[in-house]
Amino acid sequence: KTQGNAGYIDVKEANIYEEKKIETLFKDADFCINLIGILYEKKRGNTFKNIHTVFPTILAKLCKKYNLKHFIHVSALGINEATDSKYAISKLEGENNILNNFPKSTILRPSIVFSNSDNFSTQFMTLLNRLPIFPLYYSGKTKFMPIHCTDLTEIIYHILTNKVETQVI
């Protein structure tokens, strides 16, 4: 479901592995917002490297080629500390590639993004209610602050409308 008046949001379907089709989406764009990420790898194609490193790098290069005003990339909280994680390493590599290829970028590092209708929040809250204890990873130093998708959307809107300078948030 999209939010916005007719003409302000133009939804297009594309496969992230079809670089030429992705490029056609940039020709009339002002901004690029990348929300794509995975929490676990599948055997075919959808690896951390492809999704978190290669694809964002392609987007950053296209932002530069078509002189977009801004690129917002949603990454992940706590990736600096998780140096032994393939997930975190791929996220950091993607961030570095973005900033090197298109400096007019903002990297957002939220924790888990949830909505009222997703399985994550329901399953997680059920676990918290049923378990007598809850395991804390990395000696309890894991940063875990779920954010509702509406709040994340408001942050992105604020960045775009207030011309927030490049930074990692």
Where do the PLM segments sit?
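N-terminal Rossmann NAD(P)H-binding glycine-rich loop of SDR-like oxidoreductase domains
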Residues: K1
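Flexible, glycine-rich beta-alpha linker
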Residues: S85, T106-M125, K141-K143
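Conserved Rossmann-fold NAD(P)-dependent oxidoreductase catalytic core, especially the SDR/UDP-sugar
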Residues: N50-N101, S105-S111
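NAD(P)H-binding glycine-rich loop region in Rossmannoid oxidoreductase-like domains
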Residues: N5-K65, L77-E81
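Substrate-positioning beta->alpha
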Residues: N119-F120, S139-T161, Q167
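Conserved beta-strand segments of alpha/beta enzyme cores
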Residues: D10, K104-T106, Q167
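Conserved sequence/active-site signature of Rossmann-fold short-chain dehydrogenase/reductase
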Residues: Y17, I79, V113-S115, L152
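A short C-terminal helix-loop "cap" of Rossmann-like NAD(P)-dependent dehydrogenase/epimerase domains
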Residues: M125-Y138
